[in-house]
């Protein structure tokens, strides 16, 4: 039996919290626990303890040509215990990503790109021959515990002259699959117009890059969130941040917050270049940006734990509860103002730094920023 006792921490409300882990599973959670003699301990003094962070929009296919990274570099080393690769691979090459996932310490899952080759070029959906229901279904049947959703990119640079046709086909494929998988939809430059995209989306679909500052975004020419966007949100359209190199605007995010349109999930859209050169850097930096916009830590943590676990049916993750996987993130917050920048180049002062200290994955402790 492998055990670990983590103590002297606090939850995001500030209440004391301690966690006993047995054989990779959370055995007990409380303020102070009775533990077996000789049980290894980890002192979390001065730190928050939460369920392990989940980044539901990353690009961690190390073999990809355009958007690539190492799962552990964007995962446990930055306080993230679970990453979901958002469409780097399709039916033709998801097997390779699956093999990479098994070599990582970080939990890795995949959203299968509707294009069978995934993102091998920027315009993977300019050719509709990339779409194959039989190939998609076979891949999902081969990796049912690895593929947790579908991904379609619907912007001019991706679809070429095909407009919303790839999205229409994606919705048909989604309906025809035996597996009930969520669909993440990337938005960006037009055509197609955002209104035409959202018209095809349904409650439970995930709109990623929701706070981009592009002309084809959620904010209309009068500086308000478009009415059709509000209606879709109220009916259950899921907002995912998907920060990325080009897809997060402080102004758009602030306007949405004023309109009470809050993201259900906070994701980074991280890959090698925007991790090293910004503006993303890490999921923790994305947390800092929502904090500066006025979100409270108690509002943000569910966006990177409970909510993505529910949406993508990671049934034993996302909660600091008995019986759940022993995936935890231990982190500090420090009042230390710093300049942060969005995808439009706008700089703002973030008053709080979020510093991950330890990632715990299946009961094993990893020091953030340190290699295995």
What function would you assign to each model-found segment?
Residues 78-84, 88-89, 103-128, 151-158:
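Metal-cofactor-binding active-site regions of metalloenzymes
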Residues 64-73, 129-140, 191-197:
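Short, acidic/polar
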Residues 1-50:
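Histidine-rich, glycine-flanked metal-binding segment
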């Amino acid at each position: 039996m492998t055990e670990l006792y983590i103590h002297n921490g606090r939850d995001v409300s500030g209440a004391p919290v301690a966690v006993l882990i047995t054989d990779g599973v959370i055995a007990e959670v409380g303020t102070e626990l009775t533990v077996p003699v000789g049980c290894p301990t980890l002192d979390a003094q001065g730190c928050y303890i939460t369920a392990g962070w989940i980044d539901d929009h990353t690009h961690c296919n190390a073999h990809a040509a355009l958007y690539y990274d190492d799962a552990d570099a964007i995962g446990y080393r930055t306080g993230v215990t679970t990453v979901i690769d958002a469409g780097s691979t399709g039916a033709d090459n998801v097997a390779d990503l699956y093999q990479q996932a098994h070599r990582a310490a970080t939990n890795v899952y995949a959203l299968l790109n509707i294009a069978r080759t995934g993102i091998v070029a920027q315009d993977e959906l300019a050719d509709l021959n990339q779409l194959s229901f039989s190939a998609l279904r076979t891949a999902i049947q081969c990796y049912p515990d690895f593929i947790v959703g579908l991904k379609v990119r619907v912007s001019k640079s991706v679809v070429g002259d095909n407009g919303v046709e790839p999205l229409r086909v994606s919705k048909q494929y989604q309906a025809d699959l035996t597996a009930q998988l969520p669909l993440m939809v990337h938005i960006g430059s037009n055509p197609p117009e955002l209104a035409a995209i959202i018209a095809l989306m349904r409650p439970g679909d995930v709109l990623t890059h929701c706070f981009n500052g592009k002309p084809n975004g959620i904010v209309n020419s009068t500086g308000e969130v478009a009415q059709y966007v509000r209606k879709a949100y109220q009916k259950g359209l899921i907002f995912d941040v998907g920060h990325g190199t080009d897809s997060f605007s402080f102004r758009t995010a602030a306007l949405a917050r004023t309109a009470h349109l809050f993201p259900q999930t906070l994701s980074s859209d991280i890959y090698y270049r925007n991790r090293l050169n910004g503006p993303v850097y890490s999921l923790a930096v994305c947390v800092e940006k929502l904090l500066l916009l006025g979100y409270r830590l108690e509002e943000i943590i569910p966006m990177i734990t409970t909510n993505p676990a529910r949406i993508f049916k990671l049934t034993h993750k996302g909660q600091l509860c008995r019986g759940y996987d022993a995936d935890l993130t231990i982190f500090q917050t420090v009042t230390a103002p710093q300049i942060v920048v969005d995808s439009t180049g706008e700089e703002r002062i973030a008053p709080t730094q979020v510093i991950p200290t330890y990632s715990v994955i299946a009961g094993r402790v990893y020091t953030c920023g340190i290699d295995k």
